[in-house]
A protein has these predicted regions:
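An acidic/histidine-cluster motif and surrounding catalytic segment
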Residues: 1-72, 76-211
Length: 211
């Protein structure tokens, strides 16, 4: 059986370190059918460039009638919690019950709700992060038809606005390597770790209330 169509959005010429790292991450994982996709680089509006890159992938997935696809940014890496069988179980479950998007990991959310049938999945109303998302075909058109606000929108903010049915795996199976910048922002090294600590605390608090 072939793997899930997986689009890795990267720019080999501008970011050879990130390109090499992310290719290595997927090198031995046959559950993914990897396609390297050239990112749309707009130096004056990187937010829009990322969105266009993502929509190019979604358009290709729709054209090829893929029931689902995975979008990956080139700073993504698999954590020690990643397990192929568990990952595929989550992906198939979310597809069977009508989710729009499944996140491999996030930075920032509030009030996640643990799934009653899959305790490693949590429903979320909003989050920050698009570095690894499973996108199901039921929301392809909603994403493709969205009119991106050039002066205010960011990709993860758009997903928050659209009211999609979303879940995240926790513990997180895929996170972002901190290069000191993302596709749309520059920041101090260590900022990602701080955001991750804060996000983990949100889940830890919710776990304590369940125990």
């Amino acid at each position: 059986m072939s793997g899930i169509k997986t689009y890795i959005i990267s720019n080999k010429d501008r970011r050879p370190d990130r390109y090499a790292d992310v290719v290595e991450q997927f090198s031995n994982k046959t559950e993914f059918d990897v396609q390297i996709t050239q990112c749309v680089f707009l130096d004056d509006n990187r937010r829009y460039g990322l969105w266009l890159s993502m929509m190019n992938c979604i358009a290709d997935a729709k054209k090829n009638a893929y029931e689902k696809c995975i979008l990956v940014e080139d700073d993504a890496y698999f954590t020690d919690y990643y397990n192929e069988n568990t990952f595929l179980q989550y992906v198939n479950y979310c597809e069977s019950v009508g989710y729009d998007i499944l996140h491999g990991g996030i930075y920032g959310t509030s009030n996640p709700i643990r799934n009653a049938y899959n305790k490693g999945l949590w429903d979320i109303a909003w989050c920050w992060s698009t570095h690894f998302i499973v996108v199901y075909n039921k929301c392809y058109d909603k994403l493709l038809n969205y009119k991106f606000e050039l002066h205010s929108d960011v990709a993860d903010g758009v997903l928050n606005k659209l009211g999609l049915k979303r879940a995240v795996m926790y513990p997180f199976m895929v996170l972002q390597k901190d290069y000191g910048y993302t596709d749309i922002t520059f920041h101090t090294v260590g900022h990602m770790a701080e955001m991750l600590r804060d996000t983990n605390k949100v889940f830890e608090v919710n776990l304590r209330t369940l125990n």
